[in-house]
Amino acid sequence: MIQQQSLLNVADNSGARKLMCIRVVGGGNRRYAHIGDVIIAVVKDASPNMAVKKSDVVRAVVVRTKKGLRRDSGMSIRFDDNAAVIINQDGNPRGTRVFGPVARELRDKNFTKIVSLAPEVL
């Protein structure tokens, strides 16, 4: 569960390292974001000489959360960290690589490019 002021790791090579959520996209007053939801975030830490700079406002999709995700089969899945991938307006990732595992639910939400770049899909 990601809400405003939540800090997330960045799971791609766009240049950002840490994000802080400033808005959950969708619905009028939506409070929480889960895996596969789009957020608006500000870059809190970034690598030098990369495409994304510190204090940039970006769109990102949540790919991992510490809060467990319950599937229809009854299985529950949770990760060790909260992580997101920075995307552009079209929903494509700004980086060329994705680090760490991502959840299968991203495929259902039409983030197939992120799923194809990920080394492991759980």
Curated annotation (Swiss-Prot):
InterPro entries: Ribosomal_uL14, Ribosomal_uL14_bac-type, Ribosomal_uL14_CS, Ribosomal_uL14_sf. One of its GO terms (cellular component) is cytosolic large ribosomal subunit. Disulfide bonds: none annotated. SMART domains: Ribosomal_L14. Signal peptide: none annotated. Keywords: Ribonucleoprotein, Ribosomal protein, RNA-binding, rRNA-binding. HAMAP family: Ribosomal_uL14 (MF_01367). Binds to 23S rRNA. Forms part of two intersubunit bridges in the 70S ribosome. Belongs to the universal ribosomal protein uL14 family. This is Large ribosomal subunit protein uL14.
